[in-house]
UniProtKB/Swiss-Prot annotation:
Changing residue 136 to A: Group 1 mutant; abolished ability to degrade proteins with type-1 N-degrons without preventing degradation of proteins with type-2 N-degrons. Zn(2+) 3 binds at residues 112, 115, 127, 133, 136, 151, 163, 166. A zinc finger (UBR-type) spans 97-168. Changing residue 234 to A: Group 3 mutant; abolished ability to degrade proteins with type-2 N-degrons without preventing degradation of proteins with type-1 N-degrons. SMART domains: ZnF_UBR1. The gene is Ubr1. Changing residue 166 to A: Group 4 mutant; abolished ability to degrade proteins with type-1 and type-2 N-degrons. This is E3 ubiquitin-protein ligase UBR1. Zn(2+) 4 binds at residues 1101, 1104, 1167, 1170. The RING-H2 zinc finger is an atypical RING finger with a His ligand in place of the fourth Cys of the classical motif. The UBR-type zinc finger forms a pocket that mediates recognition of type 1 N-degrons. It exhibits preference for arginine in the first position. It binds N-degrons with a methylated arginine in the first position. Induction: In models of cancer cachexia, induced in muscle during the progression of wasting. Zn(2+) 6 binds at residues 1635, 1638, 1661. Its main location: cytoplasm. Its EC number is 2.3.2.27.
Length: 1757
């Protein structure tokens, strides 16, 4: 039959080319009897051809061929007509109720704390956004991959199971259309096709043969093409695999990386093709090379090309099945049926089970497809989900064992699907009842851990494998899942099966009971710390499971009693050693106890007692249910053996006490760590707390005296309480004292800790409230810190939110820090100093805080215990411990020793505890007396405490001893507490003595009242004393104040004449800017320039602490500084740099300020010599350091010695040279030196230089005016006639520092090697001056601060030093070079100056031109023979005319670029419309329009032009004011210290010698300026710019800010979920990162998006930062809610994100998962970090505080 079919198959034309019509194969298949065989023959012909090129496949062509040749024909065969039409019909037939989206790693999931049945119930982004849960208390988390959206699952949600999209009755769907049944023909076809397709997928996926295929798939002409296939494993790192491939295949790095990335993503990859021998050789080479770098060789196989082809297609067919099943429930059901059918006559299980069992052997890519198949079929149909779960449980043990042996992540293992089944309540019940799943899981645990069992059948995890044990936790997790929701209805079968599972679980606990026993090390310290982490980790994993088992048991009284019996039996079986050992007798004060001879300090002891603790938990639940009375029916009294039950927990507590007493210090850190976790919040519920409960159980059942004797014996303190003890050994005394303190503390806990439902009459809410109260008594805490200190239940809930507002109030956070909760005053009364969850540190802190608070409130410092709640009936006898003989003996002994001056067997802490016990006893008796008549109260603490200790003559009772203690000076701090106790004795005495006729409660109230009266009297007395002290202090202060005033009046003259020079450096602006300078002289430019008030400047070096006056002739002093590239002001973010550093001409700055060079300083001063020594020392120490360098020493980086800011240079501090102008000369010169004359003089000078340096060439002398003037006017030396003086001389030290700083600016600004002779060095100096001023002005404007009134100290000092450095820097350069630069700068405003590459007026930033021209201008006075500079008067005119010319040019710039759309411009103010300024603006603009051929337009009204001009020019004027102030030292007007926009403009104009109506400038200089205006407007470059309006920069430039972020963080996550990597089409986890500068989303930390920069690989973020922020950038990691600051290629740091939860806290990594909202204040702070150029500083500071040996590789971010 097979042969005949083969012939038939061959007769059909199945060429590899796509068939003309997909119906052909479909109709041919229809004629075959056996579809499976025919289908396989079809695939045998086509698949090897389609998937032939495995090494370098054309994926698009492959997909097209598969679709046309195989999948479309299959769809035709399935539907019998055009599949596109059928699928479209099915698509619109109605919404399916289950979402079923499978999460990929990194996707955000949402859970609702209000509605989810458990935390594993999650929603995908889309369902969440359209669900009711959006407005609930939701949580956000990042999926590890493999989960499943539970939208539509009614068992997952208490309310709101459907989102809008999956709602059954939503608009557009009817009940009928929700399930649109397929017609019978399609169903019949599906039943025929699906089994064959599934069988093929399964067979090919689990195919083991490397060289052969099943007979049906074999073809006659077999090729000899093989592949060497490398598989992924978790033993080898990326680099290991790349190294092995490079060596074995002799390939390039890029090819090896490509292979490695594919292997990591898909799980396998063909790395070599060829004949079998070649591939085999490659396989051996790869294995041997991989063994060189790791113990495990890489997994490599040689596969035939046809096998590879079919395996690849099988997965493609799986994806197709996923698609088809998404259209119809019928398809899913048919698929599930086919998967579950077992082949008749075969031993193999059903197909889905075969896939499950093969899962661990499959590679990653295959697993993903197959898991998706399961998700889209079985998990979408509840009935089949149940059947799948049964198959899963059937093979559970085998699957888990294989997973534990596997090395792949849990998320891609079939075992990870357990959460989808075991957490469904009905399914969990079914699996417990039908398959005893609890027993299956617990037995699996025992079967996978046998290697860790010792000869006593106890676990011992010494030398454990962390990876393997981590995988075992998955099994423990499944136990948690199955128990996560308690049954509401108990059937007999469920009860029986649960008990069976519980017994099985007890076997695990039996192996843990007493595991890893230790013995105290004596004499010699332990050599190697034993492993302890594994045992504690398993304890943590089991914590909630233990609680859940107890809760399940407590659901049913009979079940609880049976479970108690089973647990009791298990404890007794583990305690056989104890019962059979030798006994000893303990005697004290007439009582004796026979107990086992055992010492914790000598014998073996274990901290692990889960059986005993489980029994304690069950006992509490019995008490809570009131079922203790029935306990004897299940556990007879004689068999209860309470001494045995108490023994092991007591040993544990004794061990803790002895560790505190340092008796176990030779046992190393291992034991200390175990003790820490024993009491830590992560473990204490099922360790420490349960041990206390077990002792309370013992105390409630045993005779109190015997119980205390047992405690004394185990604490090894019976000798310490014998009267005869006498020792001089101080260490032993200290040890005894510590042990007594620890024992007393445990006794306090046994008697006083009743806040456990079932132990005391309390609710769960009261327990949590008490925990919170005691945490907040330590200090106010943020929400997360409180939550961290509270135990979580199985749903990760603490119950905190439900009660926190009852006990505390929330205090909102500021710009930094977080919000905190503060305890309400009314909750302070519940403070218990000996709260059993306090650590030693917390106890001390809480006690200190509460005493301090009481002192501030003028209250006594006594901290008695609050009245405890009543014990439950089962525990009511515990209070008898307080009044028993042994307790009285212990207390009396402690007090007697304290009174005895010679005794040292007591401490103050011990006394405090004894007082606390006394207080508890008296409170207990008081409460009982208040509730019942005296004769009914059996508790008799008062009389026992009042009784004499013995019949001796000097015998004393406790009250008498307290009176004596009150008088001991050393116990002054305890005096208030003693007083409180003595008063309480009186209160109880009065209650006892009241007549029986009076109702007890009444007498109790009277007692309380009298007690309150006493307290009130004391309080009033204390208040009176405090008031008297306050008045006394006030009187003294008044006297001192009077004396002070008198002294000042007497020495008034001295105060008036003293100038405050000393505080100069601390002030923000110089003091001369106020009253010392008249308002008229506050002008910086022109002949009316005010004086520069300079004072002697004496600075202190932060390194040597020596003072030095700043003088030109002295050695240099320097400011630490940082020069950096900046894009903070750019108007064109991400603008590419046209030229590299070598070719860039920095003389002219583009008006968009795309890239600037910023110089900032922290303001700290050093001697230049001291700094050089410091820098050399830093270099030396850096060479000796082993950890990563924090800064780049080659680039001159260092940390400021004082503030640790990152610096890379120093600015020399040069004093300002005072320049005084003679007013008479000024007036004379004003008549002579007009603007026209000044321009001619300047042009003549420049022309003269050109003639001088042109070497014989005839230069063109620029002519500005038509009329000729005499030659004498143009004389070369005429500029000198207006006033000169000799140049300033600087010391060599200052010159050196000037050259050093200038070279640094050049090197960093242009990113070139240092070259102090480069002609661009002065250009970069001017550029950084201009840009720094612009950046500071922009920052002040952005913050709405005044120009001079809000400068930070470091900004002020930095600008002052920078400007004076720039003046000096010119003198270190050849003046000929400066001339050339000046000529080029002036050519912008004087177009007739012939110069190369002069930019158009709209293509240059004129403030940069102004700074360069002002600083370079003195070079015109230089001559070969004599070194001159302009006189103050000459300078004043030079500055004035330069500034006026450039200002007029800038006005033209602004008006030409003004947006004529009035709606977007400034609003019209009252009176502006017909103002003089408006008329001038209109007239001037008409003139400009004529010169620009009408391109400028003239549609805008005058008032609009004037307002646009004023707004546009203000930043320029502000920058100019800063420039001239720091250049000349002239005090600015008062208005510039205040915050007034109107006053500011007129003050700026006044200071800069401008008319407030700026158009008057043009009128004043009209004859001179008109030809210039014509040339400016007629410039072809300008006219071209005007035609392209959109490309023009408008003024004022927009202030940059960080991008707008959404208020709700989930919107950002939604945005990230749609992010697709631009270079990768796969669904692998990506790390979307948002650039906060420009809003680009990048693919971070992925090889796919790495770039090569200067031969080095850099990540997408670093590459983006180089273009977007000149190497500096701020990113937000969206899926982690982390802000990252990046600088350069190798530096970065984390920074608090601006998103906060409702408690004012950030949530990096979304660990807590609370809803997050944008904090505008935090975001503003981040914006300021950027605009203040502090990003580099933040990074350096962060790296300095978080130094690591191996840091994060920022380069690949």
């Amino acid at each position: 039959m097979a042969d005949e079919e083969m012939d038939g198959a061959e007769r059909m034309d199945v060429s590899p080319e796509p068939p003309l019509a997909p119906q052909r194969p479909a109709s041919w298949w229809d004629q075959q009897v056996d579809f499976y065989t025919a289908f396989l023959h079809h695939l045998a012909q086509l698949v090897p051809e389609i998937y032939f090129a495995e090494m370098d496949p054309d994926l698009e062509k492959q997909e097209e061929s598969v679709q046309m040749s195989i999948l479309t024909p299959l769809e035709w065969y399935l539907f019998g007509e055009d599949p596109d039409i059928c699928l479209e019909k099915l698509k619109h037939s109605g919404a399916f109720q289950l979402c079923g989206k499978v999460f990929k790693s990194g996707e955000t999931t949402y859970s609702c704390r209000d509605c989810a049945i458990d935390p594993t119930c999650v929603l995908c982004m889309d369902c969440f956004q359209s669900s009711v849960h959006k407005n609930h208390r939701y949580k956000m988390h990042t999926s590890t991959g493999g989960g499943f959206c539970d939208c539509g699952d009614t068992e997952a949600w208490k309310t709101g199971p459907f989102c809008v999209d999956h709602e059954p009755g939503r608009a557009g769907t009817t009940k009928e259309s929700l399930h649109c049944p397929l017609n019978e023909e399609v169903i019949a076809q599906a039943r025929r096709i699906f089994p064959s397709v599934i069988k093929y997928i399964v067979e090919m996926t689990i195919w083991e043969e490397e060289k052969e295929l099943p007979p049906e798939l074999q073809i006659r002409e077999k090729n000899e093409r093989y592949y060497c296939v490398l598989f992924n494993d978790e033993h080898h790192s990326y680099d290991h695999v790349i190294y092995s491939l490079q060596r074995a295949l002799d390939c390039e790095l890029a090819e090896a990386q490509l292979h490695t990335t594919a292997i990591d993503k898909e799980g396998r990859r063909a790395v070599k093709a060829g004949v079998y021998a070649t591939c085999q050789e490659a396989k051996e080479d790869i294995k041997s090379h991989s063994e060189n770098v790791s113990q495990h060789p890489l997994h490599v196989e040689v596969l035939h090309s046809v096998v590879m082809a079919h395996q690849k297609f099988a997965l493609r067919l799986g994806s197709w099945m996923n698609k088809i099943m998404s259209y119809s429930s019928d398809f899913r059901q048919i698929f599930c049926q086919a998967c579950l059918v077992e082949e008749p006559g075969s031993e193999n299980p059903c197909l889905i089970s075969r896939l499950m069992l093969w899962d661990a052997k499959l590679y990653k890519g295959a697993r993903k497809i197959l898991h998706e198949l399961i998700f889209s079929s079985f998990f979408m149909e509840m009935e089949y989900k149940k059947l799948f779960a049964m198959e899963f449980v059937k093979y559970y043990k085998q699957l888990q064992k294989e997973y534990i042996s596997d090395d792949h992540e849990r998320s891609i293992s079939i075992t990870a699907l357990s959460v989808q089944m075991l957490t469904v309540p009905t399914l969990a019940r079914h699996l417990i009842e039908e398959q005893n799943v609890i027993s299956v899981i617990t037995e699996t645990l025992l079967e996978v851990l046998p290697e860790y069992l010792d000869r006593n059948n106890k676990f011992n995890f010494q030398g454990y494998s962390q990876d393997k044990l981590g995988r075992v936790y998955a099994v423990i997790c499944d136990l948690k899942y199955i128990l996560i929701s308690k049954p509401v209805i108990w059937t007999e079968r469920l009860r029986a099966q649960f008990l069976e599972g519980f017994r099985s679980f007890l076997k695990i606990l039996t192996c843990m009971q007493g595991m890893e026993e230790i013995r105290r090390q004596v004499g010699q310290h332990i050599e190697v710390d034993p492993d302890w982490e594994a045992a504690i980790a398993i304890q943590m994993q089991l914590k909630n499971i233990l609680l859940m088992f107890q809760e399940w048991c407590a659901c049913d009284e009979d079940l609880l009693l049976v479970a108690y019996k089973e647990c009791h039996k298990a404890v007794m079986r583990c305690s056989t050693n104890f019962m059979s050992s030798t006994k000893t007798v303990v005697q004290l004060c007439g009582h004796s106890l026979e107990t086992k001879s055992y010492k914790v300090s000598e014998d073996l002891v274990s901290i692990h007692l889960p059986l005993s603790r489980t029994l304690a938990g069950l006992h509490v639940r019995l008490s809570r249910l009131g079922a203790i009375s029935r306990l004897h029916e299940f556990v007879p009294f004689d068999g209860f053996q309470v001494e045995v039950l108490v023994e092991y927990p007591l040993r544990c507590l004794v061990l803790v006490a002895q560790v505190v007493a340092e008796m176990w210090r030779r046992n190393g850190l291992s034991l200390i760590s175990q003790v820490f976790y024993y009491q830590d919040v992560k473990c204490r519920e099922e360790m420490y707390d349960k041990d206390i409960i077990m002792l309370q159980i013992g105390a409630s059942i045993m005779d109190p005296n015997k119980f205390l004797l047992l405690v004394l014996q185990r604490y090894e303190l019976t000798d310490a309480f014998n009267k005869t003890i006498s020792t001089k050994d101080q260490d032993l005394i200290k040890q005894y004292n510590t042990l007594i303190e620890e024992m007393l503390q445990v006794l306090i806990y046994i008697v006083g800790e009743r806040y456990v439902p079932g132990v005391g009459n309390v609710t769960r809410e009261e327990v949590i409230m008490r925990e919170i109260t005691h945490l907040l008594c330590i200090e106010p805490m943020p929400h997360s810190a409180i939550a961290r200190n509270l135990p979580e239940n199985e749903n990760n809930e603490t119950g905190l939110e439900n009660v926190i507002n009852k006990v505390a109030t929330f205090k909102k956070p500021g710009v930094s820090g977080h919000g905190v909760y503060e305890l309400k005053d009314e909750s302070l009364k519940d403070f218990n100093m000996y709260f059993y969850h306090y650590s030693k540190t917390q106890h001390s802190k809480a006690e200190h805080m509460q005493k301090k608070r009481r002192k501030q409130e003028n209250k006594d410092e006594a901290l008695p215990p609050p009245p405890p709640p009543e014990f439950c009936p089962a525990f009511s006898k515990v209070v008898n411990l307080l009044s028993c003989d042994v307790m009285m003996y212990i207390l009396r002994t402690i007090f007697e020793r304290a009174v005895d001056m010679e005794s040292n067997l007591w401490t103050e802490g011990m006394l405090q505890m004894a007082f606390h016990i006394l207080a508890l006893g008296l409170l207990e008796e008081k409460q009982q007396l208040q509730k019942a008549p005296e004769e009914e109260v059996a508790f008799d603490f008062y009389h026992k405490a009042s009784r004499l200790g013995s019949s001796a003559m000097n015998a004393q009772n406790i009250q008498m001893l307290l009176e004596k203690l009150k008088g001991i000076p050393q116990l002054e701090s305890q005096k208030d507490m003693i007083t409180w106790i003595l008063q309480m004795f009186d209160t109880v005495k009065r209650l006892r003595e009241k007549s029986c006729l009076v109702v007890a409660t009444t007498s109790g109230l009277e007692c309380v009242k009298s007690e309150e009266i006493t307290h009130d009297k004391e309080k009033a007395e204390r208040k009176r004393k405090a008031e008297a002290a306050r008045l006394h202090r006030q009187k003294i202060m008044a006297q001192m104040s009077a004396l002070q005033k008198n002294f000042i009046e007497t020495h008034k003259l001295m105060y008036d004449n003293t100038s405050e020079v000393t505080g100069k450096e601390d002030s923000i602006m110089e003091e001369e800017s106020t009253s010392a300078v008249s308002e008229a002289s506050r002008i910086a430019l022109g002949p009316k320039r005010g004086p520069a008030v300079t004072e002697k400047e004496v600075l202190t070096c932060i390194l040597c602490q020596e003072e030095q006056e700043v003088k030109l002739e002295n050695n240099a002093m320097v400011l630490s500084a940082c020069v950096q590239k900046s894009t903070a002001l750019t108007q064109h973010r991400g603008k590419p740099v046209d030229h590299l550093g070598e070719t860039l001409d920095p003389l002219f700055m583009d008006p968009d300020l795309a890239h600037g060079t910023y110089t900032g300083s922290c303001g700290h001063v050093m001697h230049a010599v001291c700094w050089q020594k410091y820098f050399e020392a830093v270099q030396l120490s850096s060479q000796q350091r082993i950890h990563v360098d924090l800064f780049d020493l080659e680039s001159g980086e260092y940390l400021c010695p004082l503030c640790k800011s990152l610096c890379n240079t120093v600015i020399p501090i040069i004093p300002l040279q005072p320049q005084k102008i003679n007013s008479e000369n000024a007036e004379a010169l004003a008549q002579l030196l007009t603007l026209a004359r000044w321009i001619q003089t300047v042009l003549a000078r420049i022309s003269g230089y050109n003639i001088k340096h042109a070497k014989g060439e005839a230069p063109a002398v620029p002519v500005l005016f038509n009329q000729g003037m005499g030659d004498s006017t143009f004389e070369f030396h005429s500029i000198l006639s207006f006033g000169v003086q000799s140049s300033v001389k600087y010391s060599n030290s200052i010159k050196e520092m000037v050259i050093l700083f200038a070279t640094t600016i050049y090197r960093i600004g242009l990113k070139v090697p240092p070259d102090e002779l480069d002609p661009r060095v002065p250009m970069m100096t001017w550029s950084t001056c201009a840009f720094t001023i612009q950046a500071i002005e922009n920052l002040l404007g952005d913050e709405g601060k005044p120009l001079f009134g809000a400068l930070q100290n470091r900004q002020h000092n930095g600008l002052k030093a920078l400007m004076q450095f720039a003046v000096a820097q010119r003198t270190t350069c050849p003046q000929v070079l400066i001339h050339k630069h000046l000529a080029r700068l002036l050519s912008v405003i004087l177009p007739n100056l012939q110069s190369e590459n002069t930019p158009g007026l709209l293509s240059v930033d004129l403030f940069h031109v102004l700074v360069g021209a002002v600083l370079a201008f003195p070079s015109l006075y230089w001559d070969d023979t004599v070194d001159l500079q302009p006189s103050p008067l000459s300078s004043s005119y030079n500055h004035l005319y330069l500034f006026h010319l450039i200002t007029m040019a800038h006005m033209l710039q602004i008006l030409l670029t003004t947006d004529t759309d009035l709606s977007s411009g400034p609003p019209l103010a009252e009176g502006e419309e017909d103002s003089e300024e408006a008329r001038c603006a209109s007239a001037f603009f008409v003139e400009v329009s004529q010169h620009t051929d009408g391109l400028a337009g003239c549609g805008a009204p005058g008032w609009y032009l004037w307002l646009s001009l004023r707004n546009g020019i203000t930043p320029y004027l502000r920058c100019a004011a800063l420039l001239f102030h720091y250049l000349l030292g002239v005090a600015p007007p008062e208005e510039l210290f205040a915050n007034s926009a109107e006053g500011e403009f007129s003050a700026l104009c006044s200071y800069l010698s401008l008319p407030t109506n700026l158009f008057l400038l043009f009128q004043e200089y009209w004859d001179t300026i008109r030809p210039l205006l014509q040339r400016w407007c007629g410039d072809p470059a300008l006219l071209k710019s005007l035609k392209q309006k959109s490309a023009v920069v408008r003024y004022p430039r927009k202030r940059n800010s960080l991008i707008e972020l959404p208020e709700d963080y989930s919107c950002l996550l939604n945005q990230a979920s749609h992010f697709r990597c631009p270079r990768s089409a796969d669904d692998e986890r990506k790390h979307p990162v948002l650039c906060l500068f420009c809003g680009a989303i990048l693919c971070s930390q992925n090889i796919c998006c790495q770039e090569i920069v200067n031969g080095e690989e850099v990540g997408a973020c670093v590459f983006h930062a180089l273009h977007c922020g000149a190497g500096v950038c701020i990113f937000l990691k969206i899926r982690e809610c982390r802000v990252v600051l990046v600088e350069g290629k190798a530096r970065g740091c984390a920074y608090p994100a601006p998103y906060l939860d409702e408690y004012g806290e950030t949530d990096p990594g979304l660990k807590r998962g609370n809803p997050l909202h944008l904090s505008r204040e935090r975001y503003r702070k981040l914006h300021l970090v950027w605009q203040q150029h502090c990003i580099i500083e933040e990074i350096a500071r962060s790296q300095e505080t978080n130094q690591m040996l191996f840091g994060f590789n920022w380069q690949l971010l």
